From Swiss-Prot:
Pathway this chain belongs to: Protein modification; protein glycosylation
GO biological process: dolichol-linked oligosaccharide biosynthetic process
Gene name as annotated: ALG3
UniProt-annotated location(s): Endoplasmic reticulum membrane
Record field: transmembrane: 34-54, 84-104, 121-141, 161-181, 212-232, 240-260, 307-327, 366-385, 408-428, 433-453
Membrane topology: Multi-pass membrane protein
Lumenal compartment spans: 1-33, 105-120, 182-211, 261-306, 386-407, 454-465
UniProt keyword annotations, A-Z: Endoplasmic reticulum, Glycosyltransferase, Membrane, Transferase, Transmembrane, Transmembrane helix
Protein name from the UniProt record: Dol-P-Man:Man(5)GlcNAc(2)-PP-Dol alpha-1,3-mannosyltransferase
Domain of life: Eukaryota
Length: 465
């Protein structure tokens, strides 16, 4: 047998070097096998970016000082929400917001040490990023290309919302991301029985309730949360009521000082009434000058109650359509009619063995997509979006672009156009119309995706062609 001659090494030429660099860049951006290396490096790089922003960009006080003024009144003993004001208006957030900013007030000398608060929000941002990266990996099981992780850290506006504005939306976002990953874990561990998933569903109800207690926008997730809890609890309605009870009890516990459940005198009734009236005011009016999404409409239309009713109707209709898609027979393992009838067998589990929630490979993806899509529907039909509201869905946007089956280049273009909409200040007719169009496009592409929850054996490049 003749000896095997070693292959000739490629020559060190400029052309070969450039070719190697191009191949490396392509792998770093588009090869899913590189995501496990790229994502941690992005997190570390973004932690440096956060420090640079805090150290070089001036903090802008929009609501934070008003939050501190409101907290000061509460610390003086005022519990009646109708008497708690700051420079920008009355206190309109639930008790979780009060507790969170009370802690910040305590450690920042009443808000005077803004640098400390910025650092706290910097860590909060990095926590959100870490949870998002973990959820992405868990959902895609290593199949998501690195470019979508790059998009996770690419929003200038999102960085500003966290460390230069200090809005309470940031804490709600963190708690919702925590809730999602706990639900993902609950679905995954069904492969080993039902006890661990049930315990995790109770923990998820806890974090979800805490998110609601900070800001009401977390309620946009409620339909998805209830659906997933029902599935994780074996389609046993009695069992699923336990997480719902936890959710309610946490609300009572967090808001105890204002709800005063054991007191029924006139003063307690007034404090309780003011709390629910202001902290959970669904009829709150928004200012036209701050709207990011409906600027292409006239101010008269924006303030018209019939327009608000239309948005609510479209929200419900779209939500129902997506729920029907999520509950397709191939996902739940039985006809939809049987699923509905089984709800009335509330005393026993009726979950099909072939339900997607029982598939540890696909259920984390199902959980994330159902939660993120339901939230995005609420965002699309919101009566108004202010600049800080970007944080409501920014961390899920790259994943939703991935689920929309856009190719890499299209995803980058859509993301850049979306970021442009949030950077324009004040919003214009063009930027707001573009924003609504982008959100609508993403939802349409997800809805028309016939392979929304493919087997993980399907190569990633097949999903995005």
């Amino acid at each position: 047998m003749p000896p095997i001659e070693p292959a000739e090494r490629p020559k060190l030429t400029l052309k070969n070097v450039i070719g190697d660099l191009v191949a490396l860049i392509q792998n770093v951006l588009f090869n899913p096998d590189f995501s496990v290396f790229v994502a941690p490096l992005l997190w570390l790089a973004d932690s440096i970016v956060i420090k640079v922003i805090i150290g070089t960009v001036s903090y802008t006080d929009i609501d934070f000082s008003s939050y501190m003024q409101q907290i000061f009144k509460i610390r003086q003993g005022e519990l009646d929400y109708s008497n708690i004001f700051g420079d920008t208006g009355p206190l309109v957030y639930p008790a979780g917001h009060v507790h969170a900013y009370s802690v910040l007030s305590w450690y920042s000398d009443g808000g005077e040490d803004v640098s400390f608060v910025q650092q706290a929000f910097g860590w909060l941002y990095l926590g959100c990023l870490l949870l998002s990266i973990s959820s992405y990996f868990f959902s895609g099981l290593g199949k998501i290309p690195p470019v979508y992780f790059v998009l996770l850290v690419a929003s200038k506006r999102l960085h500003s919302i966290f460390v230069l504005r200090l809005f309470n939306d940031c804490l709600t976002t963190f708690l919702m991301l925590a809730t999602i990953i706990i639900l993902q874990q609950a679905s995954y561990w069904r492969k080993d029985g039902t006890t661990i998933p049930f315990i995790l569903s109770l923990i998820a109800a806890d974090t979800y309730s805490l998110a609601i207690s900070v800001k009401m926008n977390a309620l946009l997730y409620l339909p998805a949360f209830l659906l997933l809890i029902y599935l994780i609890c074996d389609e046993n309605l009695i069992k699923a009521l336990a997480p719902v009870l936890v959710l309610i009890l946490v609300q009572v516990g967090v808001g105890y000082s204002f709800i005063l459940p054991l007191h029924y005198d006139d003063q307690a009734n007034e404090i309780r009434s003011a709390y629910f009236r202001q902290a959970f005011d669904f009829s709150r009016q928004f200012l036209y000058k701050w709207t990011v999404n409906w600027r292409f409409l006239s101010q008269e239309t924006f303030n018209n109650v019939h327009f608000h009713q239309l948005l609510f109707a479209l929200h419900i209709i779209t939500l129902v359509l997506f729920i029907l898609k999520f509950l397709s027979p191939k996902n739940i393992g039985k006809p939809l009619g049987r699923f509905v009838l089984d709800i009335f067998k509330f005393w026993k589990p009726t979950l099909s063995p072939t339900n997607i929630i029982n598939d540890p490979e696909r259920s984390p993806d199902f959980v994330y997509t159902v939660m993120a899509t339901t939230n995005l529907i609420g965002v699309l039909f919101a009566r108004s979006l202010h600049y800080q509201f970007l944080s409501w869905y920014a961390f899920s946007l790259p994943y939703l672009l991935y689920k929309a089956r856009l190719n890499f280049i299209a995803s980058i273009i859509v993301y850049a156009a979306h970021e442009y909409c949030w950077l324009v200040f004040p919003a214009t007719e063009q930027s707001s119309a573009l924003l609504v169009s982008i959100l609508l496009l993403i939802l349409i592409l997800i809805f028309t995706n016939e392979q929304l929850f493919p087997s993980q054996s399907v190569p990633a490049e097949k999903k995005n062609t």
